[in-house]
Amino acid sequence: MELSEIKRNIDTYNEKLEQLRGSLDLEAKETNIQEYEEMMTDPTFWDNQEKAQDVIDKNNALKSVVNAYRTLESELEDMDTTRALLLEEDDETMKQDLEQSVQDFKNELDQFELQLLLDGPYDANNAIMELHPGAGGTESQDWTNMLLRMYQRYCEQKGFNVEIADYLPGDEAGVKSVTLIVKGHNAYGYLKAEKGVHRLVRISPFDSSGRRHTSFASCDVIPQFNNTEIEIDINPDDITVDTFRASGAGGQHINKTESAIRITHHPTGIVVNNQNERSQIKNREAAMKTLKSKLYQLKIEEQEQEMAEIRGEQKEIGWGSQIRSYVFHPYAMVKDHRTNEETGKVDAVMDGDIGPFIEAFLRSQMDQHENEG
């Protein structure tokens, strides 16, 4: 790479950073950080633990953006300084290092832009993910279990913490339903891309004739809301609370007492199970939190539907649509039908390498919003 080309790249990156700076309002973010950190020094800060954690999470999110921008800004200055030195002194090792830095910087800038795409009102929240098999018994239940492992591996790679809140094993293999609580900054922002129906085509391990089978599983994802974010009043007369014995994922943590909780909300028909805690009280608290999140999400969707009707828009039912196909036979291919992102590395995808699909979806959403704007 010639120095003139390196300069063009640096100038392009500089221009991009300036554009981002204009939309980021860094000064306002830094002011907010100062305000949050002053709040954290207050002796009464931890009196309300949920509110305190909310402040800490918001502060960390702001610092993550500001620090990432400042780091990019500093790296770009260093690269330009090195380029200027190379104009005066021909040093091949220094030039190779600079070329590598320029290439690395592009990847860092792409990742930073991706981080900025997660600016929805609840993108920073934890996520509640539910997986359900389609028709087909053992075939689709096994496919649901494969998706469960895929998401567990992806979350592990992202540094997210995954709790299995509810797990109903399949009759012979796989899983009939599973609910995950995924905790981590931007968990919902990333995982919302997975909402929809996932299709598998393979030679069935359960078919002695070795025939090809197609299986389906649905993935639903909503944000987990904190009590500080929402106000949802639930009338005790509207719910029924039942207890049952926890089954446990893979037969683990099976309770001998009925500590698992099922809450049925009669006006909406929403049913929430929680069994990963050791006591009825904690399972009830967790189940109520999930129920409130679902009711609030329902409220948001109703408002969005009303606005869509006012604007005369036809809104597609998101989770009921097929979003991705995983073909194991007669060829190997995973393809996202929303973005046309595809790969032949099926094993890597099933081992959690779904980042490219999620990134492509987020970028397509950004492009769509820009076109609408």
Curated annotation (Swiss-Prot):
- N5-methylglutamine: modified positions: 252
The GO biological-process annotations, alphabetized, read as: viral translational frameshifting
Q: Which SMART domains match?
A: PCRF (SM00937)
Gene Ontology MF terms in the entry:
translation release factor activity, codon specific
Q: HAMAP family annotated for this entry?
A: Rel_fac_2 (MF_00094)
Q: What else is known?
A: The gene for this protein contains a UGA in-frame termination codon after Leu-24; a naturally occurring frameshift enables complete translation of RF-2. This provides a mechanism for the protein to regulate its own production.
Q: What is this protein called?
A: Peptide chain release factor 2
Protein species of origin? Staphylococcus saprophyticus subsp. saprophyticus (strain ATCC 15305 / DSM 20229 / NCIMB 8711 / NCTC 7292 / S-41)
UniProt lists the gene as: prfB
